């Protein structure tokens, strides 16, 4: 499957997500201050995508929006648990 993806130039999810985020932030910047609902929805959707793949403690998520002269930056800090600790019990259960 990776051979087909490399032949047809399929983007991985990270660049696609980055492109979408850049488009949304550009739209929000051009619309002005009245678009706080868009940023709130964007934050919810980003967290929903991340929690589909890893367990996230909601208390350890920090979201910050900075607006400058021509740049808006959405910063999301998430403390990710160690993946090895989660994988070990699952591997042990599979052996039994």
UniProtKB/Swiss-Prot annotation:
Keywords: Cell cycle, Cell division. One of its GO terms (biological process) is regulation of division septum assembly. The keyword Cell cycle applies. Pfam families: MinE (PF03776). The keyword Cell cycle applies. Belongs to the MinE family. Prevents the cell division inhibition by proteins MinC and MinD at internal division sites while permitting inhibition at polar sites. This ensures cell division at the proper site by restricting the formation of a division septum at the midpoint of the long axis of the cell. This is Cell division topological specificity factor. It comes from Gluconacetobacter diazotrophicus (strain ATCC 49037 / DSM 5601 / CCUG 37298 / CIP 103539 / LMG 7603 / PAl5).
